[in-house]
Amino acid sequence: MELKVKNRQDLKARALLLGDRLDLKLFKIADCLATTPLTIQVDNGGGIAVLFRYGVAVFFGVPTLDEVRFVEMLRPLLTNPYVTPEIEELEIHSGKGGIGVQSGAVSLDDISLEKLQIIADALSKNLVLKLYEKKVAGEFDKIEPLAQDLATNGKVSAGSKKLLSKIGSMLLIEHRMVGRAEIGDKPETLWDNPNLEGLYASLEDEFELIERQSALDRKLGLISDTAQTLADVWDNKQLHKLEWYVIGLIVFEIFISLFELSGKFWK
């Protein structure tokens, strides 16, 4: 199948993060322009969509109505679809002297399927990072008062179940970034097209993918470590309570035994 949009001078890319996961197994290989990543023609004008299993669809040259129709078609294939998807747009201009990325626009010498796939990869990773940056910032806001409470009053107000839940949330974010989106990995398209390394590097710099992932990893580690520390403090507190309960029971047993012995003695 021919890539019709390659003849366009200007092209708009729109990336949408639609849900936690997108099931791609139902698409027929015969209907695809490419399978890694899955790329299909969406409308009669030749607009295409590049789909990623971690819930992102990237559209190139697709009219609004066709995009809406296609997104609706994808909804049954989504796990935990988002009510309001994350969106990123990028202008693509071809027929330029070279390849470059600046201020939300990509300049290309010509348009090819491989170049669009690389652009889609960078856009999709940018959206995943944007979503989890928001989630991690929210967790930071929630856990800071707990740490402040420990520093000020020497106690933990939240229970260990709640704290362990936060640790689980951080591990889940890390799993989705590394295991599904593979944020730190280069796109597979580069394996057969090493000449496009420069394009991907420019996009990586434009969206600061490496720096943002590194910052997010540090925040995830900090939140997880803080929650673990608070959970340990809580567990120790509960253990001390239990120890006092045991001591109390022992004292009570001794008191009962002495009472019974004293009764026998006075008889």
Q: Model regions: which residues?
A:
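Membrane-proximal low-complexity regions enriched in glycine and acidic/polar residues
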Residues: E114-G179
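Short, flexible segments with low predicted structural confidence
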Residues: S103-G104, Q148-D149, P194-N195
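Short, charged N-terminal helix-start/capping segments
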Residues: V56-F59, D66, I92-Q102, L150-A158, ...
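Membrane-associated alpha-helical segments
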Residues: G154-F265
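Short Lys/Arg-enriched alpha/beta "domain-start" segment
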Residues: M1-D109
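Short, intrinsically disordered, mixed-charge
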Residues: E72-T79, K134-D141, E182
